[in-house]
């Protein structure tokens, strides 16, 4: 029986082992026509079919601080101010606003997904996470904080 335990363990748990592939297939996830709420003025924001760099973050996320600076620079230096959207994910709205007051506002769209519906539909694992949306479809996911190499890839490969 001792010799069969490792085999039994593999049979039971092997199907649950998967890897995360950030390159999506032709079955890309569509996210158009979602409504979010602005963190700035509480107005409705519609996620449409345009090009969007959609970043999920939270005020308690230490990696999100550095990434926030990168996204501000990306938006301001590459004329993408209407294309970068930071979505506060499973966080207290007041804490999110305090984060922005502490670390600055950029030429970025700041939103909250109050019901987490968009995050659930698009398969968010956690924060930070960034999705590249082209024509209403997520075509690339960056799980974890963005780095300069990721930023360069975004600038060179997407509209």
Language model regions located:
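Structural microenvironment flanking redox-active thiols in thiol-disulfide oxidoreductases
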Residues: 66-103, 114-120
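Thiol/disulfide oxidoreductase modules built on the thioredoxin-like
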Residues: 102-106, 113-156
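Short active-site neighborhood of thiol/selenol oxidoreductases, capturing the structured segment around
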Residues: 44-65
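N-terminal "domain-start" segment that seeds a small globular fold
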Residues: 18-45
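Sec-dependent signal peptide recognition
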Residues: 2-10
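Short, conserved active-site loop motifs that form the nucleotide-linked donor/cofactor pocket
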Residues: 82, 108-109
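Hydrophobic beta-strand anchors of alpha/beta hydrolase catalytic cores
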Residues: 53-54, 84, 130
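Hydrophobic h-region of N-terminal signal peptides that target proteins for export
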Residues: 11-18
């Amino acid at each position: 029986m001792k010799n069969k335990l490792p085999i039994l363990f593999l049979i039971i748990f092997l199907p649950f082992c998967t890897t995360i592939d950030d390159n999506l297939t032709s079955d890309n996830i569509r996210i158009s026509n979602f409504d979010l709420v602005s963190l700035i003025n509480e107005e409705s924001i519609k996620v449409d079919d345009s090009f969007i760099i959609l970043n999920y973050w939270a005020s308690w996320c230490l990696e999100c601080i550095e990434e926030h600076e990168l996204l501000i620079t990306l938006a301001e230096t590459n004329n993408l101010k209407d294309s970068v959207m930071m979505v506060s994910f499973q966080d207290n709205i007041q804490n999110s606003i305090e984060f922005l007051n502490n670390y600055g506002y950029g030429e970025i769209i700041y939103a909250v997904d109050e019901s987490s519906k968009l995050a659930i539909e698009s398969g968010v694992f956690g924060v930070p996470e960034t999705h590249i949306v082209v024509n209403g479809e997520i075509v690339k996911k960056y799980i974890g904080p963005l780095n300069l190499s990721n930023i360069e890839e975004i600038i060179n490969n997407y509209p």
